[in-house]
Amino acid sequence: MTCSILVGGAWGDEGKGKCITYLCGNDKPDIIARAGVGPNAGHSVEFNGEKYGLRLIPSGFVHTDAKLMIGAGVLVDKDVLFKEFEDLKKYNVKERTFVDPRCAIITKDHRERDKKSEHLAKKIGSTGSGCGPANSDRVLRTVKLANDVPELEDYLADVSLETNDVLDNGGDVFIEGSQGFALSLYYGTYPFVTSKDTTASTFAADVGVGPTKVDEVINVFKAYITRVGEGPFPTEISQEEAESKNIEEYGVVTGRRRRVGLFDMELAKESCRINGATQIALTCVDRLYPDCARTQSYDDLSAETKKFVEEIQSETGVPVTIISTGPDLKDTIDLRKELL
């Protein structure tokens, strides 16, 4: 049995969606479990020529034999969930998705409070999804749980029990985190952070898996850094410089333009240390080094790219096992057999 957790190494938008889709398609886990805050972050998935922006359903949905679980630590907006059921109908997502009855529920009131809050909407740069107010109500013990929502009755399951049963019987579980380390309520650039911790240990707790059962922690970084909203960004470059490097990105949930910066080695080292990373996945290498676009062999990477990868490994002490060189799943260099 193996239990792997995938986490974002910076401020989110690291390319977790593609990594999850690739890893789940290749490794074929029995359960893919969503951890993290809730529908305030979007994962982009490109598969068979189609693009999907997901906020609750695990990005590994393309592995159609897996059960899809949403852990107790995740906030659920039933409207978002049901829309994704419809959007992913051909993958039979509705029939194999299960929500822990202890998930807290986001309501219209939470969304309105989020959007109307001068502090959250303007200073912090909240996505307006209602996650902050919902987590606040959870702390106050006034929030509704999934068990209280009749429309969710057919989708309820004890996620912790099911994931641990699979692991205890030799199966494989993949835990999908959201956002990124630098947005952690505890370790991020406070107060410009999200409404809970976003590290690997919390993602395990979100799903109800104990730390002794976790085998791999895969920390995802882009070859450059991006950030949506306000807050410190030490390596930020101007929009003009970003455009000169052909980098222009927009958030999946908000549509806001992402700020761009150079790779931050100090952030990477701290992220790997606190997450307990055992592997690094490096994405968007083709954006920084266009001559490496769609490369599928490490030997075919340019000397400059290899030097960059080796520097990350040397500084963090963590092997770079996955290198993404394009948006398609086949544009991936998988070095796990060689390095692990």
Curated annotation (Swiss-Prot):
Gene Ontology BP, a term: 'de novo' AMP biosynthetic process
Principal location: cytoplasm
Binding site residues for Mg(2+): 13, 42
Cofactor(s) this protein cannot do without: Mg(2+)
Enzyme class: ligase
Protein name listed in UniProt: Adenylosuccinate synthetase
Binding residue positions for substrate: 252-258
